[in-house]
Amino acid sequence: MAQSFTGKKRIRKSFGRIPEAVQMPNLIEVQRSSYEQFLQREVRAGERRDEGIEAVFKSVFPIKDFNERAVLEYVSYEFEEPKYDVEECVQRDMTYAAPLKVKLRLIVFETDEETGARSVKDIKEQDVYMGDIPLMTEKGTFIVNGTQRVIVSQMHRSPGVFFDHDKGKTHASGKLLFAARVIPYRGSWLDFEFDAKDIVYVRIDRRRKLPATTFLMALGMDGEEILSTFYETVPYEKKGDGWATPYKPERWRGVKPEFPLIDADTGEEIAPAGQKISARNAKKFADNGLKTLLLAPEALTGRYLAKDLVNFETGEIYAEAGDELDPTLLAALEEQGFTTLDVLDIDEVTVGAYIRNTLRVDKNTAREDALFDIYRVMRPGEPPTVEAAEAMFKSLFFDSERYDLSSVGRVKMNMRLELDCPDDVRVIRKEDVIAVLLTLVGLRDGRGEIDDIDNLGNRRVRSVGELLENQYRVGLLRMERAIKERMSSVDIDTVMPHDLINAKPAAAAVREFFGSSQLSQFMDQTNPLSEITHKRRLSALGPGGLTRERAGFEVRDVHPTHYGRICPIETPEGPNIGLINSLATHAVVNKYGFIESPYRRIRDGKTTDEVVYMSAMEEAKHVIAQANIKLENGEIVEDLVPGRINGEPSLLPKADVDLMDVSPKQVVSVAASLIPFLENDDANRALMGSNMQKQAVPLIQSDAPLVGTGMESIVAVDSGAVVVARRTGVVEQIDGTRIVVRATEETDPSKPGVDIYRLQKFQRSNTSTCINQRPLVRVGDKINAGDVIADGPSTELGELALGRNALVAFMPWNGYNFEDSILISERIVRDDVFTSIHIEEFEVMARDTKLGPEEITRDIPNVGEEALRNLDEAGIVAIGAEVQPGDILVGKVTPKGESPMTPEEKLLRAIFGEKASDVRDTSLRLPPGVSGTIVEVRVFNRHGVDKDERALAIERAEIDRLGKDRDDEFAILNRNMQGRLRQLLVGKTAVSGPKGLGRGEITAEKLEEIAPGLWWQIALDDEKAMGELEALRKQFDDARKRLDRRFEDKVDKLQRGDELPPGVMKMVKVFVAVKRKLQPGDKMAGRHGNKGVISKILPIEDMPYLEDGTSVDIVLNPLGVPSRMNVGQIFETHLGWAAAGLGKQVQRLLEDWQHGGQKQALIEHLRDVYGPDEELPDTEEELVELARNLSKGIPFATPVFDGAHIDDIENLLEKAGLDRSGQSYLYDGQSGERFKRPVTVGYIYMLKLHHLVDDKIHARSIGPYSLVTQQPLGGKAQFGGQRFGEMEVWALEAYGAAYTLQEMLTVKSDDVAGRTKVYESIVRGDDTFEAGIPESFNVLVKEMRSLGLNVELENS
């Protein structure tokens, strides 16, 4: 396989033995494809599928006015270009969105007064603006008000029908009560349920229950039809003293008759009473010619009539359908001359009389009564009329505007009920209700299985597109009402469509969804992995989902159908466990919203290249083998292979297997697949490991892991953190902020022949970490499309690099690694191994107040020159200034109202004759706990406000940058064009041309003598060539105009002024970069859930050291491994140790070669490590670069569940010249003595987590107080104090520390007068104070007074 540009520079040796059968899908495809389906932005208007926005418009339109004089129809929609690009939106705090224009057609009718016929009077079409729709960036995020947001996909119960029982919890007897529920996509829920007496009830929207037969009657069935639908009919004919009935063997299997069975034809006894009839005997009777049975009259007792028995002449009803036969009734019927009876086939064993009993309980007999009953339940208190009841019932389940099963619901319903109904029938039909009841009754009779609601076949994913579609529909429906009212109130003949439409409700619905929906989340931007996992998250919470409190254990648990779809490992710890999940690496979401997992087809024990994606429902029918089964030339070797059938793992014969997994890592999520030796870790720790990788802070210098899994490069590219080449080309120009690439493949004439990649420099992420991209290419490098050309945060050479490789020893050290503490070497701090940069953003606004405008200025009252040293003449801090807590970042003064003057102020006023104090200082100062360097300042001015010097300087710099981009692009375009012109002109015959070029053949030498700008003037005798010349010229002019237009647009936007909140004249944002070195109290972790807090930083000379004098970097506690069962970290240590040993050998061989040795020795060593199949670089320059990169350690990939074995690690340790045990003798840095036994030493990949002590530690002197209780606030954010609670008071009481207790409860807390006096006395240098009454006592007194109890304090 050809290696990528970065792949050549550092080759990762993989231990994977199982080839990948299918390429992993793009990791943020879920988000992108869903939103693309919603917008259908690239699809032409007439060709759009009926989904997304198109479906919403088609469902809401056409809109008719109340008297149907006019109708507003939807034609099509289109998006205009967004006003600002992504970068501009982030800087200006705008939403990245495109205006939506909808073409509507208003048709006005006129009615002929005589005939009443309608004819079209007028048709008007118009494009109407319908608000802005946010666009998704290439990274799968949205920019809303300048911040990156992610819409998390929601897991919810699929629409369809579900059968369940109460697990015996409802009734004291523990009897199972079955229930069926029809869940639509939108509309009323329909429940059918049994009660303890086996009567079937129906509930609509969980309201009061009614007998199920009431619902059937409302559907237009009568009692007789209901019974004939649910029960078979058995005919009985009077014969002598008994009743004859046809013999059916299946009815008598396993039955013990209470009376003898007699053959009606022969009169002989077939079977005696009380003897059980076996299935074999039942069949034998039929084979022997038994056709009709003669039963005693008692056999009919307890049976139910199937039809009404009526005397048609007199109209007298003798018995109704469903009546129970008893000897009296039977005798009466015989007397009336009934010789044949149709009886329901209910034997109370295999068929129960539940529907018949329900019909008996039901008071209603006619459809009208049933409709009234349903109306009373749905609208209690309203008197029902036939029309209202009919309309209400129809709108509940049979009106497509109110009720929608969705195509998913219909498909699920068809599958479960074995119906065959097209999936565009999205309302309930009578047949569906009957099928649901038949299935439910079958369950009660012991036939069939209940559904498992946690099966992924019954849960589906709603992604961005669908969530926004539902929200937009809500907005349009709100708008629909307003349109109808307006159509009726205006003169319909004169209005245009835009007069009828107010797009505010639709735009507000979209804004509300992105701004405040539970599923619209602030993107976790700590590092590239946290971004990617946030976009792949599946949440069961949110609108229409579960709540934390209601979700039980079953919903949260891992289900067999999660295999290959949802990761069983990655989920948060805490109340959300199991409710928030992550998509597995290879999983995709299908068009119905079900998660599918890929499998390879197996035919006759042989694997094929065919890969099929299956949902949980489809998979249930197949026998699936694991990915690690032994294969030889594609054929399964063993007769019994490990696999699963119906989710249950078992050993299966190879002949039965028809599918196999595509990869061992298809089970886990992206984060879990980044943990090497995951298979050797306990699941709880693996969970912590996956979650903590997402909290790793990007470091100044990252290392890719020596021991990786091969997923690192995929994550880096798919997350969008690195810059990937769009087209093949050559690097023309490069600096820290951009890369200019000239495309070399034949480019489309309409596209520029140059790509400019702007790099992000020191940008602030959502979590205040630093986003900084660094180029990896040099001028002249040839790159291919898809190559990584620049690294981003937490990446190195195009691979994810969340932390650093550190030399670790597992041993106790003077108690400093007690309870998972970590001891680190001073070298780590000195060399900035774990130093990170954090960028804090501060903003200040100058508003227009009632007393006058606030002003951003350097002229601040009562502030010395020292405090203003970093400010420029506009009062804004300079870039590069070092700032400390309390320093002024932006000087600002606010007008203050006239207050009485002190004598001193009056004197000043008299002397200087001007207002000395009409403004107060409201400058933006750096808060406590932050110090750093100013890296960026942005100034925003309201349109029409004069810009200060600083704003103009920033604007000039930005215009220069844009101009440079334009000029560079033009220069390359010019060079390209000259090359193409030269090719076209050389060898042709000139007819005329500029001065210096004679007629005749054009040669390269002649062309060189003429300025390239004049080549266009050459006229050729060849018409075809002349046509090409003209086409080139037009193309060149168009490209130049396009560049100029783009430049002018951007400059215009810069100079136009900014859209600021109301009342704000000017806004300044200041970005401060804070350098955070590692210090005691910071949290660190490995990738195996092995986390700890730094306890001490030890001088290098005191750290334990190896025999060659190398000090270890980190000392971890060995007791942290056995009980936690995350042995993966030990394997990683050994393999990392081998990697570093082999790297040293590469370095030695490289040095030998560079000092006159043999190149071959180095190549042979690399071949020995990588194996003969690995492709090594061709050129010496590339080989040297590779060897240099490998000298720190040879990187390995051990894919999850398919990684390195112990013997692999031991062999590599041996190759590296190290002990096969992976242990080494260490020496005590303090005494120089060797420790008694060898210690496990090696390289572990350590992460610094986003739990930094600087962000947590906090101290308060004087700060804000609570308004009512006057006690100090709590928490760092409020600059609060430490609470001295009840238990602490007991402690002081126990010590008898009365005075300390008194000051804690009064002057240090809520004694307002007392604390002011303390402050004054401290200022005076005095330390006496008096405690008064705490405010909380006054609050208590007031509370008592509010209850009518007067409390007065008496002086004693």
Curated annotation (Swiss-Prot):
Matches recorded under InterPro entries: DNA-dir_RNA_pol_bsu_ext_1_sf (IPR042107), DNA-dir_RNA_pol_bsu_external_1 (IPR019462), DNA-dir_RNA_pol_su2 (IPR015712), DNA-dir_RNAP_su2_dom (IPR007120), DNA-dir_RNAP_su2_hyb_sf (IPR037033), RNA_pol_bsu_bac (IPR010243), RNA_pol_bsu_CS (IPR007121), RNA_pol_bsu_protrusion (IPR007644)
Tell me the Gene Ontology biological-process terms attached to this UniProt entry. DNA-templated transcription
- Per its UniProt record, what PROSITE patterns does this chain match? RNA_POL_BETA (PS01166)
Pfam families (alphabetical): RNA_pol_Rpb2_1 (PF04563), RNA_pol_Rpb2_2 (PF04561), RNA_pol_Rpb2_3 (PF04565), RNA_pol_Rpb2_45 (PF10385), RNA_pol_Rpb2_6 (PF00562), RNA_pol_Rpb2_7 (PF04560)
The protein's UniProt keywords, in alphabetical order, are:
DNA-directed RNA polymerase, Nucleotidyltransferase, Transcription, Transferase
Q: Give EC number(s), comma-separated.
A: 2.7.7.6
Which residues are connected by disulfide bridges in this protein?
none
Q: Which reaction does it catalyse?
A: RNA(n) + a ribonucleoside 5'-triphosphate = RNA(n+1) + diphosphate
GO CC terms in record: DNA-directed RNA polymerase complex
Q: Name one GO molecular function term.
A: ribonucleoside binding
Is Mitochondrion one of the keywords UniProt gives this record? no
Q: Which NCBIfam families match?
A: PRK00405.1, rpoB
Q: Which family does it belong to?
A: Belongs to the RNA polymerase beta chain family.
Q: How does it assemble?
A: The RNAP catalytic core consists of 2 alpha, 1 beta, 1 beta' and 1 omega subunit. When a sigma factor is associated with the core the holoenzyme is formed, which can initiate transcription.
Q: What does this protein do?
A: DNA-dependent RNA polymerase catalyzes the transcription of DNA into RNA using the four ribonucleoside triphosphates as substrates.
> How is this protein named in the record?
DNA-directed RNA polymerase subunit beta
Q: Which organism is it from?
A: Phenylobacterium zucineum (strain HLK1)
